[in-house]
């Protein structure tokens, strides 16, 4: 179960939620019938199917969440700029094209955007374990992801030079709460907004893109096998 799916489904009384720390463990649970289905964001579900034979996505969308950025509590000016940018971005051809790539049955293809390097600095917390939103491309060794595309488009329009601080999602979430950087990207979801507002550890931007939560299940136990690394 992915983080967004966890928020969206934990309150449901008609299902029993079991959490796994790795995709490999989750697939093993499916294989040995410890669970009936796995819930996750559609883009990540596509990637899992590209790594494991014998699984399928159940087409019905079980929930819809929104992608957001987490913003330093001291940077209300930045929050306002991001929300202004997102209002335009949501209606743009760039957003439509990115959404299509994220939800492609072939899997997400990263399109690198060069940072124009403006006269203002923007420090960005970047999880390297949040595929397809932010991660390290193991072929090039560079940062990649859909959130990286979006923050770079924003930075170029508003005159920022990007400075990245990498880490796993947990450390990035802690870091933005402690004011270590201006903004954090990489799979922050609108479903967590209430918790963020109550704890007051950071602010959340408006939603810039919706995403679907879907189930995956075993289609054929006889052909179930890993064909490429999962985690």
Please identify what each model-predicted range represents.
Residues 1-3, 42-64, 73, 148, ...:
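Acidic, polar ligand-binding/catalytic clefts
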Residues 63-71, 131-136:
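Surface-exposed aromatic
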Residues 25, 44, 94:
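Residue-level recognition of oxygen-bearing side chains
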Residues 68, 121-123, 217, 231:
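Residues that mark the start of a beta-strand
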Residues 10-14, 31-35, 50, 74, ...:
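Sec-exported extracytoplasmic/periplasmic mature domains
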Residues 74-88, 146, 226-231:
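Short amphipathic alpha-helical coupling segments at ligand-binding clamshell hinges
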Residues 1, 7-8, 12-28, 37, ...:
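Extracytoplasmic small-molecule ligand-binding "clamshell" domains
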Residues 4-20, 53, 57-61, 83-121:
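Ligand-binding clefts/hinges and TM-proximal coupling segments of bilobed small-molecule sensing domains
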């Amino acid at each position: 179960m992915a983080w967004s799916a966890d928020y969206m489904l934990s309150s449901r009384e008609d299902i029993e939620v079991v959490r796994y720390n790795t995709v490999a463990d989750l697939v093993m649970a499916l294989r040995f019938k410890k669970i009936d289905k796995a819930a996750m964001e559609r883009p990540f579900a596509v990637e899992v199917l590209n790594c494991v034979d014998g699984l399928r996505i159940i087409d019905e969308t079980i929930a819809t969440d929104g992608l957001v950025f987490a913003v330093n509590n001291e940077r209300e000016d930045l929050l306002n700029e991001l929300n202004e940018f997102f209002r335009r971005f949501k209606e743009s051809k760039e957003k439509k094209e990115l959404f299509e790539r994220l939800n492609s049955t072939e899997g997400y293809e990263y399109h690198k955007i060069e940072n124009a390097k403006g006269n203002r600095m923007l420090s960005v917390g970047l999880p390297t374990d949040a595929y397809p939103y932010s991660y390290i491309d193991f072929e090039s060794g560079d940062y990649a992801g859909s959130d990286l595309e979006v923050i770079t488009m924003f930075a170029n329009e508003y005159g920022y030079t990007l400075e990245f601080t990498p880490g796993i999602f947990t450390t990035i979430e802690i870091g933005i709460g402690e004011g270590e950087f201006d903004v954090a990207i990489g799979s922050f979801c609108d479903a967590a907004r209430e918790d963020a507002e109550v704890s007051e550890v950071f602010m959340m931007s408006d939603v810039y893109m919706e995403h679907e939560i879907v189930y995956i299940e075993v289609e054929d136990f006889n052909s179930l096998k890993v064909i490429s690394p999962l985690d």
